[in-house]
Amino acid sequence: MKTQFVILMITVILMQMLVQTEGGILGKLWEGFKSIVGKRGLNDRDQLDDLFDSDLSDADIKLLKEMFK
C-alpha cells in the first residue's frame, strides 16, 4: 500500500511539472506566432482598408489597381 501511494505521489508531482512546463512552452509558441503575424494579422480586417486612407492619391490608387489586375 505504501508503494502504491509513493508511486501515486510521484506521478502527481511529475504530472504537475509537465502541465506547468507545457503551459510555458505553449505560451512561448503563441507569443512567437503573434509576433510573426502581428497585430493586424490577428484582427478581422479587410485588406482593402488602405484604399480608403486619405493619404493615398489618385495615382497611388491607379497603380494599386494595375498591380492587382
Swiss-Prot record:
It is found in: Secreted; Target cell membrane. Disulfide bonds: none annotated. One of its GO terms (cellular component) is extracellular region. It comes from the Eukaryota. Residues 41-69 form a propeptide. GO terms for biological process: defense response to bacterium; defense response to fungus; killing of cells of another organism. Keywords: Amidation, Antibiotic, Antimicrobial, Cleavage on pair of basic residues, Fungicide, Membrane, Secreted, Signal, Target cell membrane, Target membrane. The keyword Transcription does not apply. The keyword Metal-binding does not apply. Residues 1-23 form the signal peptide. Expressed by the venom gland. The modification Valine amide is found at residue 37. Amphipathic peptide that possesses relatively strong activities against Gram-positive bacteria and a fungus, but has very weak antimicrobial activities against Gram-negative bacteria. Also exhibits very low hemolytic activities against human erythrocytes (64 uM induce 21% of hemolysis). Belongs to the non-disulfide-bridged peptide (NDBP) superfamily. Short antimicrobial peptide (group 4) family. This is Pantinin-1. It comes from Pandinus imperator.
